Amino acid sequence: MIRPLVIALSLALAMPIAQAADWTLVNVVETPGSTADALPLRKGDTGSANLNRFGFYSDLTFDPKTGDWFALADRGPGGGLIDYATRVERIHVPYHTATGVIGQPVIKKTILFKAEDGVLFNGLNPLLLNADKSLLGASFDPEGLAIGNGGHLFVADEYGPSIYEFTSSGQFIRALSVPQNLKPVQAGGTANYVDGRPTIVNGRQDNRGFEGLTFNRSGDKLYAVLQDPLVNEGSSNEGRRSRNVRVVEFDAASGQSSAQFVYQLESRSVLNAIDPSTTDDFSATQQGRSIGLSAITALSDTEFLVLERDNRGLGVDVTAVPLHKRVYRISIVGASNVQGVSLAGSNSLPMGVVPVQKADEVDLLAALKAQGHEVPEKIEGLAIGPQLADGRTLVLLGTDNDFSVTQSGAGEQFDVCVNRADGTRAQVALNAPCPAGKALIPGVLMSFAVDFSAVN
């Protein structure tokens, strides 16, 4: 084992990751949480949270061939407990070609995801939709989006986790082959797509499946990131304690997985030390649960931008003060292929395993606070857009506002209305008006002008 380890480390050290690009936050655009999408309504329908409310940016991608952006909604309002036809929004984002200042997005088309038999994919969890926790069926929680060379939509799902290919109009084509070690199973090997630990003993954590998806620049490979470590990996075989998240490589043509790499989250001890005076530190079991990945987008065939964040900030629940919203640049050059390698039993990597190289790219929290913006909890979309007149590149980041909907322990849904000035909140019946002075949580787009030429 010594010689392979030396070789791997030598490769990693011989090919240092490039320095960060120069990121400038240009402006921030908020879209009201009550905004409707472009779904055609039947006669008599007036619209509702789970029918046509804009679900914003669980992921975001840019199509250079058309100049349009695609905004992915997730499983809908209510955390998988109410009916919702899953979808992607084709949008136009006006921008100034010299400065990168963006305006309000305009939805051009709402695209529903349809199965082979014409049935719409649905955000309901498998138990509610299929009456069977072991049957995924048309249950779908879209979280990652990439556009293929032919304009097809590739979507990463959190329930499975799954990756599906659709036509540009949303018609299902195929499912890629997801490695068995990622699939949630009970003791004995029965699939269970609904429950979490301790019922699930192997595979992805509940609500922590695939969270981001990208093609490499050549377009022949796909890379998906899980949000957090697998449920069984880490000390005490508990993923919540681990920093080690899997990046999964797929061959686009065959749909087969070809490799898995380890991405290491920032240590909770580092994040807790940001403000030593606070008492709301991340606990040991929040390391691999409250800190996670939200997006990945390719810079080349081997380098990627990855969005890492905590679960704090403006959202449907009151949280502690946010500490961590960053974009990192990673390289898979020299990283070990851990497909078939267990990371269970320890938070440390096995001897000889080299993680992806990781370097700080931009501190989103600092950039937002420097301009007086409130920090959203769920910054989840990250997309590289067109080149600006001065050679810089327009990069957009977007938020998931959970449709500004929460639910009670009994499974009843409510709209969340917030007064941003004083922080007061109210919960009202779905689709009911917010009290005076309060509004639904908005969707947020952040425009950055990025000088990638500054990278050495």
Task: Indicate where each model-derived feature is located.
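Gram-negative bacterial Sec-dependent N-terminal signal peptides
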Residues: M1-Q19
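Sequence/structural signature of beta-propeller domains
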Residues: A20-N456
